[in-house]
């Protein structure tokens, strides 16, 4: 009997320890695949999906398993096509992605792409965007000489470009769709076929529906900085812009905010606007700067 007891003792102890085995064993690494919302990336002017290879690497490193789609549409010179045409093309591309992601998606939209994405959020009545990350985008328009403009309109300067952009011919170019001359506000309001509409600055029959759609977004993350060198004024990335004297008025001083014409004031009131300014970054390096990614983008990719 004593020998039999000694033989059975380990088995008895094993039975007693079974409930505690999970505590005694090392924890397995958490499985990330499938736990993060898909990310959709929209490029900017004269850009392509290749420009975002660093950003793609950063996301894969920090949020392993995230499905990231860098949309390869309207690349290079095709990015000059009218923005409403681009909105339609990108809409057809994002709908299937959203339909496969019932928990929602994130949008990272760079430069001109930020305006495309804001229009998408306005016209899509069933979008499920959680974080809309606007990366150095001229959200309140552009009023500055850049190499792009000098190449496209070599005989025009900033002060007289309105003559081109506020014509039916000019509105066929994406850049002119958000050209915002503070010295010719009436012409801008009457001629702008894109920015004045998504801003709710000009009455149109879809204004109420677009505002409701835009407010479906979970969070609006605004990124930009004083050393951008292209977005003019750089505060346009944060919905600031020039007045008639070229003094920058911040977002809270803008008529579109005060009237809450497309939902900015409502978003801010519910704590859904994140502003992340960062100095020392030029326009073409926003999407490859690791510090910027860690500080301003990664925290919002849940």
Curated annotation (Swiss-Prot):
Catalytic-site annotation from UniProt: 111, 228, 283
This enzyme's EC code(s): 3.1.2.2
Phenotype caused by lack of the gene: Mice are healthy at birth, but develop neuronal abnormalities, infiltration of bone marrow by macrophages and multinucleated giant cells, and splenomegaly caused by extramedullary hematopoiesis. Autofluorescent storage material is present in many cell types, particularly reticuloendothelial cells and neurons.
Compartment annotation: Lysosome
Highest taxon listed in the record's lineage: Eukaryota
InterPro entries linked to this entry: AB_hydrolase_fold (IPR029058), Palm_thioest (IPR002472)
Cystine connections: 109-117, 165-176, 276-296
Molecular function terms from GO: fatty acyl-CoA hydrolase activity; palmitoyl hydrolase activity; thiolester hydrolase activity
Record carries keyword Transmembrane: no
Keywords noted in UniProt: Disulfide bond, Glycoprotein, Hydrolase, Lysosome, Signal
Top EC class, one word: hydrolase
Catalytic activity: hexadecanoyl-CoA + H2O = hexadecanoate + CoA + H(+); S-hexadecanoyl-N-acetylcysteamine + H2O = N-acetylcysteamine + hexadecanoate + H(+)
Glycosylated residues, chain numbering: 60, 190, 206, 245, 289
Pfam families, per the entry: Palm_thioest
SUPFAM superfamilies for the chain: alpha/beta-Hydrolases (SSF53474)
Signal peptide as annotated in the record: 1-27
GO terms under cellular component: lysosome
Function (record text): Catalyzes the cleavage of thioester bonds from S-palmitoyl-CoA or S-palmitoyl-N-acetylcysteamine (unbranched structures) but does not have activity against palmitoylcysteine or palmitoylated proteins, branched structures or bulky head groups. Conversely, hydrolyzes both long and short chain fatty acyl-CoA substrate.
PANTHER family, alphabetized: LYSOSOMAL THIOESTERASE PPT2, PALMITOYL-PROTEIN THIOESTERASE/DOLICHYLDIPHOSPHATASE 1
Homology family: Belongs to the palmitoyl-protein thioesterase family.
Protein name stated in the entry: Lysosomal thioesterase PPT2
